[in-house]
Amino acid sequence: MSLLSRFFYKRPPDGLLEFADRVYVFDSCFCTEVLADSLYQIFLHEVINDLHEEFPESSFLAFNFREGEKKSVFAETLCEYDVTVLEYPRQYEGCPMLPLSLIQHFLRVCESWLARGNRQDVILLHCERGGWPLLAFILASFLIFRKVHSGERRTLEIVHREAPKGLLQLLSPLNPFPSQLRYLQYVARRNINSEWPPPERALSLDCVIIRGIPNFDSQHGCRPIIRIFGRNYSSKSGLSTEMVYSMSDKKKPLRHYRQAECDVIKIDIQCWVQGDVVLECVHMDLDPEREVMMFRVMFNTAFIRSNILMLNSDNLDILWEAKDHYPKGFRAEVLFGEVENASPQKVPTPIVNGDETGGLPIEAFSRVQELFSGVDLAENGDDAALWLLKQLAAINDAKEFTRFRHKGSFYFNSPDSEEETNTSSAADSSDEGFEAIQRPRIHIPFDNDDTDDITLSVAHESSEEPHEFSHHHHHEIPAKDSVDNPLNLPSDPPSSGDHVTLLPPPPPPPPPPLFTSTTSFSPSQPPPPPPPPPLFMSTTSFSPSQPPPPPPPPPLFTSTTSFSPSQPPPPPPLPSFSNRDPLTTLHQPINKTPPPPPPPPPPLPSRSIPPPLAQPPPPRPPPPPPPPPSSRSIPSPSAPPPPPPPPPSFGSTGNKRQAQPPPPPPPPPPTRIPAAKCAPPPPPPPPTSHSGSIRVGPPSTPPPPPPPPPKANISNAPKPPAPPPLPPSSTRLGAPPPPPPPPLSKTPAPPPPPLSKTPVPPPPPGLGRGTSSGPPPLGAKGSNAPPPPPPAGRGRASLGLGRGRGVSVPTAAPKKTALKPLHWSKVTRAAKGSLWADTQKQENQPRAPEIDISELESLFSAVSDTTAKKSTGRRGSSISKPEKVQLVDLRRANNCEIMLTKIKIPLPDMLSAVLALDSLALDIDQVENLIKFCPTKEEMELLRNYTGDKEMLGKCEQFFMELMKVPRIEAKLRVFGFKITFASQVEELKSCLNTINAATKEVKESAKLRQIMQTILTLGNALNQGTARGSAVGFKLDSLLKLSDTRARNNKMTLMHYLCKLVGEKMPELLDFANDLVHLEAASKIELKTLAEEMQAATKGLEKVEQELMASENDGAISLGFRKVLKEFLDMADEEVKTLASLYSEVGRNADSLSHYFGEDPARCPFEQVTKILTLFMKTFIKSREENEKQAEAEKKKLEKEAIKEKSATKKDGVDNDNDLIQQIHRHRT
């Protein structure tokens, strides 16, 4: 179709670029040069004349995005040709955007114009100098609205590629992509709700929180100014725009924030906004005094979810080169409130003094000057407190809460990421058709329900000037001459004949076939037809009615023919050619001539089997013929490759042979060799084919007698005696032997070759590597031991039977099972008169019984039976069962299969559970694993190009194929994961927010804490009386940490111990003030930054849910249930997040009020620092009180011991006095 479209492509008129069907853009929009008015009018005349000639029966509608409010030359010129012109402003408060109502009007006018009449009407788009950023956004909106493209960022980049590289940076000092993408998402959401756009909400913009201080001056900080532009509802029409808020209007001096001092900026605003709003943050540089734009954001209040707007540096319009000015983790939060709740509450900032809180009088500290006289408080100011706070931050960080941090970010990317695939539904057909505009004035609805609110100018000769938006040039931003282009726009402007509608890239070529079967033929020969059925190399064969043998294992020999089928007929499969077998080697001719094609099949003999004649045992073979010259090569037939041969041919002699020396006598008839004399062969390895092939003589050669025995090596090897032909084998080429047939004659089977001193036939030649040679005769090395009888049923019986045409062909030795060795002492030379010598001489004596090799192998094999069975099973399964097709990377496929084993659900049921969003069937861990193993774009393309049997694919590939049945399966899985964790995530976040609110309320409402703080203030003034630090009305919160650092002169107590002692003596009811602060310790472990990240994850998750709900509109029946469940979840989650956002906004205000309560600045002493100081003070106070109690208990015990000691001493003195008195009386009597 693309070729046909190019063939029938009609070039547009000069000066126009075809953007879509019957939609053209003036190519003057892509340049910065301005033509003179006269030349410009001539250019327009030529373009319109060409258009009328090209489309004589069409009507034309032109859109112009002008600068200023005057009627443009473009409109005046096109009016002369009966072209309807609509003009729009080129910007909205400095943003290259239009209000949402004008965007809606433009889209519906275009839809009505293109659909009316006989569908021949044409739309023209034009912008004046510098209007390309807005025109690009309008064109992208048109593509999204008409569903030409999906994905907002991708669509916008496609449009910008039509302009020269660097044009956007040249015309716009700020990157307008984020705000334009936000409004493109508004356009794409038109199908979610029946009413689009939704009603514009009136909100109260409460505050702006900036987390992470941008670096815009030499002191690594900024001095921010917030300005807000919106609709002026106080005007007569209520449609004009104005600056509704500015910090520069206030008389307060601008504060400078530095990264070293704080990391959060909170600016209270409290202004009403509705509809399209532009929020600017400007840095005021005082040296020299100038304004630098930090960021700008444009949004519509109709799409504000949950009364919160969270933005990072990628979602803000910033200067092109200012990306590195923002720290990692920078985020701007705009908090809204309902209009009925917009009245701000005054933050209580009580002055802490003795009169209000009822602390202790100064007289209560009469002993403090005595205890701490001469002891100076720490002179290093905040250093000790700051060091201690750092230690506390390292110890008491929010370890318990950080488990929420990355939970939401796993499921969703940024809402403006490049992976968006948002689509929009068909245009709303319920709107009334747009009539041809030929009047001097056109009414364009600014609101959704009023079509007569705003008047735009139509190109006509009317002298009236319609009312336009007032544009406030509120700041100037120096534009760069040369800037970097982040969009990689094309360097050359498109020609006038270029078409904007981009076709999707062609699919990549299909992957090469995984299984190729090639045969080795001479380069001069054409490829052969399919190989024939296997030939039976025997003069005897089976009856045609006999079923074919089982699938043959590949032969072990080195085959130089291409007839080595690996599957049984019918139909004959292509041979498998593999070079993996290390045992197979290539027999290369010495002259290294190119290999000829394989020989044609022998003629089909009669199906009747003549009875063979009984023949005597074969006589001794004649002497061998002279060896052929080493340089001789057998000519190749010049005939083309043969067609597929008939069914199996029977006969051991070929009909095409090279002339040979006199052959030996004919071979004996086939004999039935008992099982004791030969063992069945093991399954051979896969067949191999190399570049070598058998060279056969001319087809006209008559069939000679039976073939000669194998010749010696072509090299200078000794001439061995020619053995007689071995009994023919009834095995098929490359297949295990079937059961031996009964003898066809009643004559007894001939005995094995007689043993004599004369040389006997050697065993079949072994596997050669490079060249082939016959074995030396018996006794060549002086050995008189008899050779083993030639096995008739193992592999090839002779190289000449059914295969050789008088040519020695190398074959592989039959694979023998390794037997366990008998470790005996070998006798190499039989001594005269010994048993061994007599045994060799007595030929007529009974010989040892024949050994059953098969039984021996089964009993004494070196490999265990289980290993043999496993190997046989593997070999058999690899042949009987076709291999699985592997398209995905092996490691990824293995990991995917391991993951699937953990999901005990069939793939169709799993997909049904995903589409039904059933959290009972799949848990969050399983959903996360499914997200990790979603197919990539490359893997999906690879699977789409696969045309083979899908049953042959591996488990991972089949899993990917199932996932590909659902559109955007990864996005649906992420939505599913968000739904599973949403309830727990919201509950935990709500619990943390409630904890902060409770702790804030407890601290501010605790009367005991207030009295203790007042007591500390009085204590400090008593110590600092008469110094510069005295007569204080309050103290910084970090001063609480210095109470434990100030010691008395005797170093036995600190000021904290004295405070506890004093409170215990004077006001013991205050000692348990910690009971009023139940939630303080838990709140000290919570970081507001973490809560903000969790809140952002919830809001962004809802945005992704909404986007997927919109994108699934076009999925068809497969997503009907998914859409229904997702819509119900979205309605429920929206209310939850809205409640959560209101609670989050309240927590932010309460956290700031807590800092204000202690007279601190929230930017320098945030909520986290306040709670940690108070928690440490509370713990230190309790510890000091306990230590005081222990000290008092110890002193009490000491006093008790001293009292007992004194009492005992007094008692002893009394006893001594009594004794003295008794002695005196006794003396007196005597």
From Swiss-Prot:
Disordered: region residues: 412-432, 460-822, 1187-1230
A GO molecular-function annotation: actin binding
Gene Ontology biological-process annotations: actin filament bundle assembly; microsporogenesis
GO cellular component terms attached to this protein's record: microtubule cytoskeleton; phragmoplast; preprophase band; spindle
Domain of life the protein comes from: Eukaryota
Residue ranges occupied by any Phosphatase tensin-type domain in the UniProt entry: 1-194
Compositional bias segments (type: Basic and acidic residues): 1187-1215
4Fe-4S in keyword set: no
Transmembrane segments: none
Comp. bias regions, Low complexity: 484-496
Record keywords, A-Z: Hydrolase, Protein phosphatase
Residue span, FH2 domain: 809-1207
Active site: C127
SMART domains with a match to the protein in the record: FH2, PTEN_C2
A Pfam family reported for this protein in Swiss-Prot or TrEMBL: PTEN_C2
Ranges annotated as biased composition (Polar residues): 579-591
Keyword Hydrolase: yes
Gene3D superfamilies in the record: 2.60.40.1110, Formin, FH2 domain, Protein tyrosine phosphatase superfamily
Stretches assigned to the C2 tensin-type domain: 200-339
Compositionally biased region (Pro residues): 503-514, 524-535, 545-556, 566-575, 592-630, 637-649, 660-672, 679-688, 699-711, 718-728, 735-766
InterPro entries hit by this protein: C2_domain_sf (IPR035892), FH2_Formin (IPR015425), FH2_Formin_sf (IPR042201), Formin_homology_domain (IPR051144), Prot-tyrosine_phosphatase-like (IPR029021), Tensin_C2-dom (IPR014020)
Family: Belongs to the formin-like family. Class-II subfamily.
Protein's UniProt name: Formin-like protein 14
Organism: Arabidopsis thaliana
